[in-house]
From Swiss-Prot:
Belongs to the glutaminase family. Pfam families: Glutaminase. Substrate binds at residues 64, 114, 160, 167, 191, 243, 261. PANTHER family: GLUTAMINASE. The lineage of its organism: Bacteria, Pseudomonadati, Pseudomonadota, Alphaproteobacteria, Hyphomicrobiales. Its EC number is 3.5.1.2. GO terms for biological process: glutamate biosynthetic process; glutamine catabolic process. Homotetramer. It comes from Methylorubrum extorquens (strain PA1) (Methylobacterium extorquens). GO terms for molecular function: glutaminase activity. This is Glutaminase.
Length: 309
């Protein structure tokens, strides 16, 4: 194993000193209030060893990173029937684009763009009241993170609801094709709330361990999903996890990952570690600017890219 402690601390120190931090998300008012100077990085391996740097224990809004876990949960509920409602291809379009959805008859291109994640949320909601579905998602997050203190930031959820007109348009358009089956307000309510879950880098890195270890969560002591399903979720993270910046992330970092407009990125080094980085300043595609740079530095120093050293 490389000397992860010194690597992580070196990267955190370098990121702290960089002036080019990107811009915080402004279209969700609560996220616009976040201090752009924040930076945290955590790496956790299968033996529970932790390397942490910067603001590793500062909670932030996980936003679209939650889509990895709702996809995992929905696949556990309905299996491959999920793929009748959502595709598995990169979109090449902004995460909240409606143009592609119109061309493809209401079927979202993948589960990590907003339309796809709303459709996945609708599957989880089926047969439940919204509060029950949301409770199931939150309990799953607490379980994989091994931390029952994780909660939803209600201010962020309310802020998203007040300004979520594009998401409402996506959901109503999918409803017209019966891709959404529940009342749109119910589905969007659950969606806004799971995106508003607040977690730290340490908690998110712990939550991603089952994806790094073939579906087995080494700290929980048993399997969360099958090895095949973990491999397939990782594949979708690699190809679709960073909106229309997914190809560039694969080129530069070479790890399965999922970003969120709260500035977090969850990345998976299969068989080696789960990684979470947070820096709220975003690039033009809506991904953490310094987060991507930090992960690129990490894989160069560890040789963890899935494509080789």
């Amino acid at each position: 194993m490389p000397d992860l402690d010194s690597i992580v601390k070196d990267i955190a120190a370098e990121m702290r000193a960089r002036p080019d931090r990107g811009a915080v998300a402004s279209y969700i008012p609560e996220l616009a209030r976040v201090d752009a100077q924040g930076f945290g990085l955590v790496v956790i391996d299968g033996e529970g060893r932790v390397a942490a740097g910067g603001d590793a224990d500062t909670p932030f809004s996980i936003q679209s990173i939650s889509k990895v876990f709702t996809l995992t949960l929905a696949l556990g509920m309905v299996g491959d029937r999920l793929w009748r409602r959502v595709g598995r291809e990169p979109s090449g379009s902004p995460f909240n684009s409606i143009v592609q959805l119109e061309r493809e008859h209401g079927i979202p291109r993948n589960p990590f763009i907003n339309a796809g994640a709303i459709a996945v949320t609708d599957l989880i909601l089926s047969g439940h009241q919204p509060r029950e579905a949301l409770g199931e998602i939150l309990r799953f997050m607490q379980f994989v993170a091994q931390d029952d203190s994780i909660t939803i930031d209600e201010r962020v959820a309310a802020s998203e609801k007040r300004t979520g007109f594009r998401n409402a348009a996506l959901a109503n358009y999918m409803r017209s094709f019966d891709v959404i089956e529940n009342p749109v307000d119910y589905t969007l309510g659950v969606y806004f709330h799971h995106c508003a879950i607040a977690m730290t880098c340490r908690q998110l890195a712990t939550a991603g361990l089952f994806l790094a270890y073939s579906g087995h969560h080494p700290l929980a002591g048993h399997s969360v999903i099958s090895a095949e399903r973990a491999r397939r979720i990782n594949a979708i993270m690699l190809t679709c996890g960073h909106y229309d910046g997914s190809g560039d992330f694969a080129y530069r970092v070479g790890l399965p990952g999922k970003s969120g407009v709260g500035g977090g990125i969850l990345a998976v080094a299969p068989g080696k570690a789960s990684i979470c980085v947070w820096s709220p300043g975003l690039d033009a595609a809506g991904n953490s600017h310094l987060g991507r740079i930090a992960l690129e530095m990490l894989v160069k120093r560890t040789g963890w890219s899935i494509f080789g050293v």
